[in-house]
């Protein structure tokens, strides 16, 4: 059963400027394994984190670093939740997040479906 759907878009150039202006933003938003990615990938991952939050009803207390986009070579990206995000997802009955990412023409897009088993 679908618990929630979230969609977000991020202007890559604007996101890059924000990160350049506020370097600590990377630490607040991304885990160690995410921070060294190119701006397009970071923007798409931030859109994914926003989409996860929306799929959960925009809960208070969600820590951005607790939502991680993981991708192994040759596989599609997946959402992993830890800490605050895991607690919120568990309380909502979410068993799996389905993720679609794209970036084109300077815009990064993410769609997330939160599903129970």
Swiss-Prot record:
It is found in: Cytoplasm. GO terms for cellular component: cytoplasm. It catalyses: apo-[ACP] + CoA = holo-[ACP] + adenosine 3',5'-bisphosphate + H(+). Keywords: Cytoplasm, Fatty acid biosynthesis, Fatty acid metabolism, Lipid biosynthesis, Lipid metabolism, Magnesium, Metal-binding, Transferase. Mg(2+) binds at residues 8, 50. GO terms for biological process: fatty acid biosynthetic process. InterPro entries: 4-PPantetheinyl_Trfase_dom, 4-PPantetheinyl_Trfase_dom_sf, ACPS, Ppantetheine-prot_Trfase_dom. HAMAP family: AcpS (MF_00101). This is Holo-[acyl-carrier-protein] synthase. It comes from Kineococcus radiotolerans (strain ATCC BAA-149 / DSM 14245 / SRS30216). The gene is acpS.
């Amino acid at each position: 059963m679908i618990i929630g759907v979230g969609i977000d878009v991020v202007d890559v150039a604007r996101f890059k400027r924000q990160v350049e202006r506020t370097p600590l933003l990377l630490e607040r938003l991304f885990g160690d394994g995410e921070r060294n990615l190119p701006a397009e990938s970071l923007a798409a991952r931030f859109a994914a984190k926003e989409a996860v939050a929306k799929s959960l009803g925009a809960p208070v207390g969600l820590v951005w670093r607790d939502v991680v986009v993981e991708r192994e070579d040759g596989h599609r990206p997946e959402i992993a939740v830890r800490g605050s995000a895991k607690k919120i997802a568990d309380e909502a009955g979410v068993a799996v997040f389905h993720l679609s990412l794209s970036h084109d023409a300077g815009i990064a897009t993410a769609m997330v479906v939160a599903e129970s088993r």
